[in-house]
């Protein structure tokens, strides 16, 4: 899995002009699923995400997790994180998991995440418009194959 993590003051996702998911303070996740991803990748990602200390404490130190601040998560599927740009000018996406596998894996990821913190989602495979107010900015890349 490859996940772009953005600390946000608020974020929302819309599909065809209708708001699908909306959060206040928390994390916006852009989630890519790879063909080799397993249950252990899912567990690792969830554990890291809910415990990652990237929110400021009273002293202004990044010392609190999304769980600590009782924040929310907006999770968006993003197969383009597996783009291969080595050849030519058009990215290839053959490094991403096939849609059926990726959709099931993404759903399982969100269900497990929702056991820890409130989660809103987009719709897998939909054309989505994502709006956010990045807080910091703080943007982190989590790759479950690099641990």
Swiss-Prot record:
Subunit structure: Homodimer.
This protein's name: D-aminoacyl-tRNA deacylase
Pfam families registered for this protein in UniProt: Tyr_Deacylase (PF02580)
Motif Gly-cisPro motif, important for rejection of L-amino acids boundaries: 136-137
Coiled coil: none
Record-level GO BP terms: D-amino acid catabolic process
Main location: cytoplasm
Keywords recorded for this protein, A-Z: Cytoplasm, Hydrolase, RNA-binding, tRNA-binding
EC id: 3.1.1.96
CC per GO annotation: cytoplasm
Domain topic, free-text comment: A Gly-cisPro motif from one monomer fits into the active site of the other monomer to allow specific chiral rejection of L-amino acids.
Task performed by this protein: An aminoacyl-tRNA editing enzyme that deacylates mischarged D-aminoacyl-tRNAs. Also deacylates mischarged glycyl-tRNA(Ala), protecting cells against glycine mischarging by AlaRS. Acts via tRNA-based rather than protein-based catalysis; rejects L-amino acids rather than detecting D-amino acids in the active site. By recycling D-aminoacyl-tRNA to D-amino acids and free tRNA molecules, this enzyme counteracts the toxicity associated with the formation of D-aminoacyl-tRNA entities in vivo and helps enforce protein L-homochirality.
Location of the protein in the cell: Cytoplasm
């Amino acid at each position: 899995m490859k996940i772009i993590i953005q600390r946000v003051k608020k974020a929302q996702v819309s599909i065809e002009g209708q708001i699908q998911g909306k959060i206040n303070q928390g994390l916006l996740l852009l989630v890519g699923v790879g063909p080799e991803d397993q249950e252990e990748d899912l567990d690792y990602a969830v554990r890291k995400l809910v415990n990652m200390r990237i929110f400021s404490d009273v002293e202004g130190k990044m010392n609190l997790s999304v769980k600590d601040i009782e924040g929310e998560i907006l999770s968006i599927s993003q197969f383009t994180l597996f783009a291969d740009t080595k050849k030519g000018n058009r990215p290839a996406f053959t490094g991403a998991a096939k849609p059926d596998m990726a959709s099931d894996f993404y759903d399982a990821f969100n269900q497990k995440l929702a056991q820890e913190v409130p989660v809103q989602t987009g719709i897998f495979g939909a054309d989505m418009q994502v709006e956010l107010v990045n807080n910091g900015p703080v943007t982190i890349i989590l790759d479950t194959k690099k641990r």
